[in-house]
Amino acid sequence: VEFFNSLYINSLLSGPFTQALNIKSGIYEALIRPIEQIGGGAVRADLRSIRLGFAQYQGMMMGFKNTMEATYLALKQGDAVLDPLMRTQDNLEIVGGKAVRPISGANLGFDGAAGTAIDWIGNVLELPSRLLMTGDEFLKQSNYRGRLWTNAIENTLERGLSLSSKEGKENLKRIFNEGFDKNGMANIKDNAINKKTLDYARESTYTNSLKGGSYRDWGSKIQDFLQNSPEFRFLAPFIRTPTNLWRHFGNRFPIQMPGT
């Protein structure tokens, strides 16, 4: 079933406009959220909030080289680097932090020459979903690094340290370096700052969890149903991202919408 679901989903993703829309909407969100914080700080005359809003942009620019390196790695290996568990394509099975490719020799029970041939065919057929994942990696890396820098600055200021002092610079460097494990994944184990940072990156790429959400949590319920009944996946190939897009719209609507 997942073999045919993968063919169907990749056919939907094969259009260049679909890929462009994914990147464009993610870039808009990455740029708008700091503006919201800066604007809110300006209205309240809160210089700290304004400073942290600009720090988000600073962090994204500072980490651009590393973001591109991680994005290339994701494209090369065909899997997410920073956050393998939450992604736009929500029908994939995750085992050991890696996505199981539906069209692969291992998944279909073939090895040797036959398995290699199926892997090659799968790489071609699943190229659209790989490109989608690569775009998500770029956006999520940018948001994560920007927010990590923002949270590092906030933590340093809360400790009463000057950002230009030796102690302040060491604290900034420590927090930023602790943001990733040895494989480049977000290091969220026993680290509240990094967990908060990853949540921000997920929200900015519309890949945050649907559980406990608005509209009586229907998005999460539909997602669970399709995970347990993949034969119906063709009815709604994507659940997480469209639901989060709608929730983001509801959160920004000037009048509270029913169910939010």
Predicted regions and their residues:
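Amphipathic interfacial helices
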Residues: V1-T260
